[in-house]
Amino acid sequence: MTAYETLWDFAEDHYGIVTTSQAVAMGVDKHQLPAMAKRGTLIKKGYGVYLVKHHIPKENDVFAHSVALAGETAYLRGASVVALLKLAPTNPGIVYLGATSRVRRRLPANLRLVDMRPCNCVQYEGIRSQPIDEALRTALDEGAIEADRIADAAVKAHDEGWLTEAEMNKFIRAVS
């Protein structure tokens, strides 16, 4: 199997994204990635982050790509987790991220990053994320989503099995 085929197999399960550290872990020489980008088989998205050229875009690509651009300790947080799970309408132009370590990378203007925050991260749709109860609380505290939409999102999250009834009621009381 060629290096590109190895990267392709991995990237298709990860929203078309492969990082340098992931490629090295799969046995691909890190110097091959810039060469593949120069040939046009990979598209460089940011420092150490590449997109497989033949990737067919999916609905949640923007979230996965944003987390990858922010680094290995990054995660989706707040309103972006709510948007990922389609629990409430949010501003699609802004992606809210957190990171457990300091992030020094220069990120696109639409990414709102808060670093040095601990997180008990979970995977939603294969994307590292803040747990939904914490995400709803963060979105409410930051004013990223209106209070009535937070209550509706909590009910919907409960209906889909993401929240317990006690957690749902806590959010409904908090916004009342």
Write out the residue ranges for each language-model feature.
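Short gly/ser-rich loop at a beta-strand->alpha-helix junction or flexible surface loop bordering the NTP-binding
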Residues: 2-4, 12-21, 29-176
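The alpha-helix within a helix-turn-helix
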Residues: 24
